[in-house]
From Swiss-Prot:
It comes from Homo sapiens (Human). GO terms for cellular component: autophagosome membrane; early endosome membrane; late endosome membrane; lysosomal membrane; plasma membrane. GO terms for biological process: calcium ion transmembrane transport; inner ear auditory receptor cell differentiation; locomotory behavior. Residues 104-118 are annotated as: Extracellular/lumenal pore loop. The record marks R305 as: Interaction with phosphoinositides. GO terms for molecular function: calcium channel activity; lipid binding; monoatomic anion channel activity; NAADP-sensitive calcium-release channel activity; potassium channel activity; sodium channel activity. This is Mucolipin-3. Residues 444-464 dip into the membrane without crossing it. The chain crosses the membrane at residues 63-83, 284-304, 342-362, 372-392, 415-435, 476-497. Gene3D superfamilies: 1.10.287.70. Homotetramer. Can heterooligomerize with MCOLN1; heteromeric assemblies have different channel properties as compared to the respective homooligomers and may be tissue-specific. May heterooligomerize with TRPV5 to form a functional distinct ion channel. Interacts with GABARAPL2. It catalyses: Ca(2+)(in) = Ca(2+)(out); K(+)(in) = K(+)(out); Na(+)(in) = Na(+)(out). It is found in: Cell membrane; Early endosome membrane; Late endosome membrane; Lysosome membrane. InterPro entries: MCLN_ECD, MCOLN3_ELD, Mucolipin, PKD1_2_channel.
Length: 553
């Protein structure tokens, strides 16, 4: 007799044969045989890799690929991280160097307090920054240079933004102002002579009307080459620094804040030559990345094949149940055929392949998108490590975490949705009421971060202590606000959240001792008592031949 497995497969695949099979009268023995075959097929599908090896001698290729992949992807990420670390360090050190170079009297950690308060100090700062720019080659200890535009070097743009008209008389409490903003700019060429005198003698041909002035911006470009990568057997990158020094007088409070912003872009060096073995090492790294791509491609194909087989078996089982039991399979039972771990591995493989391609482009200096590559490789590595948990879950002593998370997730999501409503209410209230009086409540983002820190018990005293006492009513409100938030979230909501997880954990432990509730699918499978090493599962591997040939006759 031919393998009955194919009967079910054939009937589930072709609607015409399904109708034929449904109408055909089969003997009770044949029906029992079909049920037995379906149970055995389902039981084999839900076996772990070791049991499948005992049942049919099938090698656990996906497990071997995942173990190999986790080692290779982790090594790749570490190597890329070390390279990216040099890029980040070079950016940060250059930004600090530029602040010391172009901001007069700048000291570290002065970004929030660096400001001037007199007109002469404003002109001093402007003249100092321009002079440092013109004397760059004489004052800078780095390999910085002006940007070349053809035969000329890029100029520094000095722009002031101010109200079109403004007559302000604070003594009389009167003003006349046109809020339209105008801009005036002029340029300073690096090769032009520049005479430095006193602020009264030389004001850069720039006259500032501080009553109307909003901002003054000095913008210029510099270039540099990151040579430290050579010591790590990597080709250097070329950097473009777009520097903007801003004198902010928008508040007109008598305090002009000064800041330096550094917009950095990495470019491929146009003409380079490095002696030694750097080129060879670069080729080795690209070969390694190519092998990672090949490994992930194999993993991707195997997992996609497994997902497709699961969906095919799902449809086959649904048709079988409808044909023999006149019942529809529940959605929860159907979802058991969709392996979420495989889907996660597929996503990680796709991210790794794309990230590895970008990494190879970066190493070849034809691409400089470090941030995108970091996100792709970092996310993929995280998912690869999480995917290994699936194989640990096949052991009863290791799958408690997985089962608890799966069981608790729906209730946790519902609970978090309710808690989020309360949390957002406190965020909006704290921002609008406490924002003018507390540094940690100046923006919605800062409010959310501050409240989340309070939930974790961090920085509580500082949050209370930094509240200004200029308004007694607001100060009293802040105490009620903070005490109620801490009491509500730490003692009630957080405790209920932990209790929700704990209750699920205890339930899972009890299930492990007394047995899990049987679904309709699991009950159907449990009637198959054949052990993996019984040899009966090997019969399912025969080529497919339909038993119901008479349907087509």
């Amino acid at each position: 007799m031919a393998d009955p497995e194919v009967v079910v497969s054939s009937c589930s695949s072709h609607e015409e044969e399904n109708r034929c099979n449904f109408n055909q009268q089969t003997s009770p023995s044949e029906e029992l045989l079909l049920e037995d075959q379906m149970r055995r097929k389902l039981k084999f599908f839900f076996m772990n890799p070791c049991e499948k090896f005992w049942a049919r001698g099938r090698k656990p290729w996906k497990l071997a690929i995942q173990i190999l992949k986790i080692a290779m992807v982790t090594i790749q990420l570490v190597l890329f991280g070390l390279s990216n670390q040099m890029v980040v360090a070079f950016k940060e050190e250059n930004t600090i160097a530029f602040k010391h170079l172009f901001l007069k009297g700048y000291m570290d950690r002065m970004d929030d307090t660096y400001a001037v308060y007199t007109q002469s100090d404003v002109y001093d700062q402007l003249i100092f920054a321009v002079n440092q720019y013109l004397q760059l080659y004489n004052v800078s200890v780095g390999n910085h240079a002006y940007e070349n535009k053809g035969t000329k070097q890029s100029a520094m743009a000095i722009c002031q933004h101010f109200y079109k008209r403004g007559n302000i008389y604070p003594g009389n409490d009167t003003f006349d102002i046109d809020p339209e903003i105008e801009t005036e700019c002029f340029f300073v060429e690096p090769d032009e002579p520049f005479h430095i005198g006193t602020p009264a003698e030389n004001k850069l041909n720039l006259t500032l009307d501080f009553h109307r002035l909003l901002t003054v911006e000095l913008q210029f470009k510099l270039k540099a080459i990151n040579l430290q990568t050579v010591r790590h057997q990597e080709l250097p990158d070329c950097y473009d620094f777009t520097l903007t020094i801003t004198f902010d007088n928008k508040a007109h409070s008598g305090r002009i804040k000064i800041s330096l912003d550094n917009d950095i872009s990495i470019r491929e060096c146009k003409d380079w030559h490095v002696s030694g073995s750097i080129q060879k090492n670069t080729h080795y790294m690209m070969i390694f990345d190519a092998f990672v791509i090949l490994t992930c491609l194999v993993s991707l194909i195997l997992c996609i094949r497994s997902v497709i087989r699961g969906l095919q078996l799902q449809q086959e089982f649904v048709n079988f149940f409808l044909l023999h039991y006149k019942k529809e399979v529940s959605v929860s039972d159907q979802m058991e055929f969709v392996n979420g771990w495989y889907i996660m591995i597929i996503i990680s493989d796709i991210l790794t392949i794309i990230g590895s391609i970008l990494k190879m482009e970066i190493q070849a200096k034809s691409l400089t998108s470090y941030d995108v590559c970091s996100i792709l490789l970092g996310t993929s590595t995280m998912l690869v490590w999480l995917g290994v948990i699936r194989y640990l879950g096949f052991f009863a002593k290791y799958n408690l975490l997985i089962l608890t998370l799966q069981a608790a997730l729906p209730n946790v999501i519902r609970f978090c949705c309710c808690a989020a409503m309360i949390y957002l209410g406190y965020c909006f209230c704290g921002w609008i009421v406490l924002g003018p009086y507390h540094d940690k409540f100046r923006s919605l983002n800062m409010v959310s971060e501050c409240l989340f820190s309070l939930i974790n018990g961090d920085d509580m005293f500082a949050t209370f202590a930094k509240m200004q006492q200029k308004s007694y009513l607001v100060w009293l409100f802040s105490r009620i606000y903070l005490y109620s938030f801490i009491s509500l979230f730490i003692y009630m909501i957080l405790s209920l959240f932990i209790a929700l997880i704990t209750d699920t954990y205890e339930t899972i432990k009890q299930y492990q001792q007394d047995g899990f509730p049987e679904t309709e699918l699991r009950t159907f499978i449990s009637e198959c008592k054949d052990l993996p090493n019984s040899g009966k599962y090997r019969l399912e591997d025969d080529p497919p031949v339909s038993l119901f040939c008479c349907c087509k006759k």
